[in-house]
Every structure is written in structure tokens, then in C-alpha cells.
Amino acid sequence: MDAWEVVDRTPDMNVIDSIWAFKLKRFPDGMIKKFKARFCARGEQQLAGVDFFETYAPVVQWTTVRLMLILEILLNHKSKQGDVTAAFLHVELEEDEKVYVKMPLGFRKKGKVLSPKKMLYGSRHSPREFWKYLSNAMVACDMQPSRMDPCLFVGPKVLAIAYVDDILFWAKDEKDINDLAIRLREQGLLLEQEDDAAGFLGVRLSYTSDGKIEMKQTSLIDHVIETLGLDTKMAKSKWTPAEQ
């Protein structure tokens, strides 16, 4: 993706460290989906006003997520899930936000550093710049951000919400979602589509036979219990209002 170039290190450079971040990506039921290794910049070492200026990036509100799931039921819409591959690397780095990064472990060369051409994971302003990129791509495809929630995009036939690189789409006809996905790819977005929305941000979505959508976090609860070393037989449990 032509993300950086190797340059000579000079005394006036503010060079920040880099790390490898290893992560398991899981399905909503907790099963392992893929192993990920990501090269990241140590953003906490960036200098405000020198390496970056603004960092705020909106994310979809959970009230909006719940509202859209309710509309899916009431309007009998189809839903599909999308994920943007290497999201931050879509964004070209502006010259006034130039940052230099140490080469990753295993590839270091004496006197050499990386000069990123694209936004790197870990950079303080990467989320903001990607949100602007995604928003512009949506607008170019006739998807307008809502005034109530800028991460809710409303189009002639499709509705979408975005939480950084995770996107949910809704439409009466699945073909309209597929057509929008094609247009977004034409805008340069590396968008992977999945089947019906099975989960979002760690919450599992289950569709019942009587037309309801259940939201569960069983895998997260099990992970917390395991991490804390709790005995489920000894721990006291409480019913949620929805289960009573």
C-alpha cells in the first residue's frame, strides 16, 4: 500500500518508537476469526502542535445502534456487515503532519527511520483523519451524515452506521447494499462484506423466529470471569430487566 519510505535519520527529526501489536479477532460467539499482527506508531510520543493538531473523531452512539435494529424489525429491512481492511492506511499523510518512526523490530537498519506516507495505527490523529476519509467517501456515494449522529449515514435506499472501520448496512433490498459497496470500493475503500449482521463491537446479534433481535455479550462475560478467576457456581447472578 506504499505506506512509508526509508530515509536517513537527521539530528532535527522527532523520531517516535514503533511496536508490533498482536491481536485475536473473534466472532461474536467468541470463536477465533483471525490472528492479526499490526505495525503501530507510539502515538503518545508525538508532540501536539508539531506532529498533529486535532484528534477528535466521532463514533456511532449506542442509542443509534439500537434505533437502527428496531427499524430493521419494523421495516423488515435486510442487514449486512462490512469491515474496512487496513483502514488508517487509506489516508494520505499531510506534509504539515509529517512524523518519523523507528523501523520495526526485525527490519531495523542503522541510521535509517521510516517516513510514513499514510496514517499509521497508533498515531494520535489517525482515527480523525480516517473518519473524514470515510465520511467523504459516503457523501460521494449519496450517503449523507445525520445531524443527530454524524456516524449515521442516510441514502436514498440504504442506511449505514460506522464505528471507525466497522460498518452496518440496512436496506429493503440486499442488492442496494451490494451496489453501495461497489461504489464505495470505487472510491478506494477496501471494504469486505459479510452476511447478515451477526454482531457489532463485541455484541452478538441473534435473530429469533418470532421477529426479535437479541443482543448478547456472553463471550465477553465469560472472558471477564475467566480473567478474574471467578467460579461461576459460587458467584451470584442477577437477571437483566429484559429477562425478567
Residues covered by each model-derived region:
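Long, low-complexity, charge-biased intrinsically disordered regions
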Residues: 1-244
